From Swiss-Prot:
This is Ribonuclease 3. It catalyses: Endonucleolytic cleavage to 5'-phosphomonoester. GO terms for cellular component: cytoplasm. Digests double-stranded RNA. Involved in the processing of primary rRNA transcript to yield the immediate precursors to the large and small rRNAs (23S and 16S). Processes some mRNAs, and tRNAs when they are encoded in the rRNA operon. Processes pre-crRNA and tracrRNA of type II CRISPR loci if present in the organism. GO terms for biological process: mRNA processing; regulation of gene expression; rRNA processing; tRNA processing. The gene is rnc. The active site is at 42, 114.
Amino acid sequence: MQLEKLQKKLGHQFTNLDYLKQALTHRSAAAFNNERLEFLGDSILNFAIGKALYEKFPKSNEGELSRMRATLVKEQTLAVVARQVELGDYLKLGAGELKSGGFRRESILSDCVEALIAAIYLDAGIDVALARVYQWYQELLEQIKPGEAQKDPKTRLQEFLQGHRLKLPEYEVIEIKGDAHNQSFRVSCKVETLTDVVFGQGTSRRKAEQHAAQQAIEKLKIK
């Protein structure tokens, strides 16, 4: 019954439920997990969003289209999509992940969305998979528009500092916690015009640096 409810939320009734079950299974729970589906779903999602943006913004250049796509397929956005269907309630996690609140973790939720896209593709074909992506992303695609806000925090911070002829920020990993498959990075970011060092956290060094850059942007009040 639980999976029946989820399928209604997703807008797709699976012919082969094994695809859905695999998409919901995190690597901490079983060897037969969603990692391969996630790989395939990532490619389908990038194509789907790229196609939608190409058609919606005929005057936008490659850089603007790439930045908008990055905004729509990033971890935080995928986690928003996951929460719309309360995906965390249906995840199959190992005991450790369950205890640490893995069903709320953005990285796990976002990976599962990508896996679900692949599962729908394998179950019903590319047209159905694309239709579901556009259904889930309808509001986000309506709201997105070209502009500075689409640039990632590190790029925005760097361009601001270069524009004011200031030194580039210095990032340094100061702490790594957790097992290899579930690491958390803490990064410091030194900016010439800020008296205090800012910090960021994330499931990878890159994400932690982006988070730290965002903290610097907010302190510098960069628009």
